[in-house]
Design a protein with these regions (language model features):
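Conserved, structured core segments of small domains
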Residues: 1-93
Length: 93
């Protein structure tokens, strides 16, 4: 089942994002199976990262919660908000 994981950064956490970026990339590479799409969210300036989104196939919501619980950005306290919702792809190129 697809879930969208939508994560918004706390304000003023740019240094944490930069310091944790390598661990985040390694975590995503290790857990890439089932990822349909993912990447950073940007402010309107198209330069400032303000969060992340991942659309991934999980067996259930608990697996999605465990995935984000162990994600390095989340463990470092980067996120102000984390939303996990079932997702249905109407268009899948």
């Amino acid at each position: 089942m697809l879930f969208a994981v939508y994560m918004i950064d706390k304000l003023g956490m740019e240094a944490v994002r930069a310091q944790t970026g390598k661990a985040h990339a390694e975590y995503m590479a290790t857990n890439e199976e089932g990822i349909r799409m993912g990447g950073p969210l940007y402010a309107d300036d198209h330069k400032t990262m303000i969060g992340s989104v991942v659309i991934k196939d999980f067996s259930n919501r608990t697996d999605a919660e465990n995935f984000i619980k162990n994600e390095p950005f989340n463990k470092a306290g980067l996120f102000e908000t984390v939303m996990i919702n079932p997702f249905k792809a109407f268009v899948d190129n």
